[in-house]
A protein has these predicted regions:
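Extracytoplasmic gate region of multi-pass secondary transporters
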Residues: 1-49
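Helix-to-loop junctions at the C-terminal end of transmembrane segments
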Residues: 49-60, 145-146
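Structural signature of the two symmetry-related core transmembrane helices
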Residues: 63-78, 158-159
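Hydrophobic core of transmembrane alpha-helices in multi-pass small-molecule transporters
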Residues: 88-102
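Intracellular juxtamembrane helix-capping segments at the cytosolic ends
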Residues: 102-115
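A late C-terminal transmembrane helix in Major Facilitator Superfamily
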Residues: 114-148
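Symmetry-related core transmembrane helices of the 12-TM Major Facilitator Superfamily/SLC fold
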Residues: 154-170
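Intrinsic disorder in cytosolic terminal tails and internal cytosolic loops
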Residues: 170-183
């Protein structure tokens, strides 16, 4: 479950980072505007990461994940729809970045709780392996963009957040790990 949430969110973030500059360029925007959009998104991600960590230490992590995933979908859709022009578009881009990476601290801690004797391995699985898996999906977004254009492909990719949300709502998520029974 945790792996799936991490992979889905990684896909969404990488699809945004890949498509947004292309969308801006195709709409007649400058490369500088594309760079500004990515800088806003990535800068907000760093704030989201720290905030997500603070919140994960202070509240139920499953509830936090559900809320972050729930809010991340409209934020990403608005960021793509509005683009980084105007206050509303810049705010949407920042919110999308913030919410997207704020999911990572609770994901990592929950993975570590599932494998308390292998915390480094669990972190590597939900970061490295899940991120690589999610990144592979961007190939599909690119192929879709060749058919329907980057704007539509980006918008159609964002509902993958619903997969993360569904997994975060799964009743097994957040239950304490059962101790291994040895012989």
């Amino acid at each position: 479950l945790i792996f799936g949430i991490s992979a889905a969110m990684a896909f969404v973030q990488r699809a945004f980072l890949t498509m947004e500059p292309i969308i801006i360029s195709r709409a007649g925007g400058s490369e500088a505007l594309g760079a500004i959009a990515l800088s806003i998104y990535l800068g907000a991600q760093s704030v989201g990461m720290v905030t997500g960590g603070l919140l994960a230490d202070r509240m139920d992590r499953r509830t936090l994940l559900v809320r972050l995933c729930f809010l991340a979908l409209p934020a990403h859709l608005a960021a793509i729809w509005l683009g980084p022009t105007g206050v509303l578009g810049i705010t949407a881009t920042a919110c999308a970045g913030f919410l997207g990476l704020a999911t990572l601290p609770p994901i990592v801690v929950m993975a570590q709780e599932l494998m308390p004797s292998s915390t480094a391995v669990s972190s590597g699985i939900v970061m490295g392996l899940a991120w690589a898996t999610g990144s592979l999906g961007v190939l599909g977004t690119g192929a879709l963009a060749d058919r329907v254009g980057p704007f539509a492909a980006a918008l159609l990719s964002m509902p993958v957040i619903l997969v993360a949300l569904g997994l975060a709502l799964h009743p097994e998520l957040g239950r304490p790990a059962r101790p291994a029974t040895g012989a």
